Design a protein with these regions (language model features):
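N-terminal positioning helix adjacent to the helix-turn-helix/winged-helix DNA-binding module
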Residues: 79, 90-94, 127
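Helix-turn-helix DNA-binding module
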Residues: 105-123
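N-terminal interaction/assembly modules
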Residues: 1-89, 141-145
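Short amphipathic alpha helix immediately N-terminal
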Residues: 90-108
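Secondary-structure boundary/capping signal
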Residues: 94, 121, 143-144
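DNA-recognition helix of helix-turn-helix
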Residues: 117-138
Length: 145
């Protein structure tokens, strides 16, 4: 496994994962409201010949979807916390370089970093490589075997 690629992937997905935590919470609230509406309609239907009603199917689907959201939220939250811990072990300069290269990559990010940090292009890439190595070690432990 290429641990450095995994670390880069974690950095690139950090902001999207963090945003998804808010979105999943909102989605769960919407499903809970929908579940209340389904329960209200439950008294109106009677299954035919012992089969399940469409409303019961909708209730079960709603429950399963909420459970999936809970599990996804837990997993995503852990990944966000792990990434934040990995970033917290870096210097401000290293964090800024990784952010501009991977997390918030925009046009001319190298030039921006050259101006912001006062270094030449080769030095920016050296800082990026060292920061990425340190981040990868903090995320995955020993990677050089």
């Amino acid at each position: 496994m290429n641990w450095q690629k995994e670390a880069i992937n974690d950095l690139r997905q950090y902001y999207a994962r963090k945003q998804s935590l808010e979105n999943m919470a909102e989605r769960k609230l919407a499903l809970e409201e929908k579940f209340k509406a389904i329960k209200c309609a439950m008294s109106d239907s009677t299954p035919v010949m012992g089969g399940a009603s469409r409303i019961e199917d909708n209730m079960l689907n709603n429950i399963v979807e909420r459970q999936k959201i809970d599990l996804n939220t837990e997993a995503t939250s852990r990944l966000v916390k792990i990434t934040e811990r990995g970033l917290s072990g870096l210097s401000d300069q290293q964090r800024l370089v990784l952010e501009k290269f991977y997390m918030d990559a925009r046009m001319n990010h190298v030039e921006y970093l050259m101006d912001a940090l006062g270094y030449e292009k080769t030095r920016i890439y050296e800082i990026k490589d060292r920061a990425l190595y340190s981040f990868t070690i903090s995320m995955f432990g020993i990677i050089d075997y």
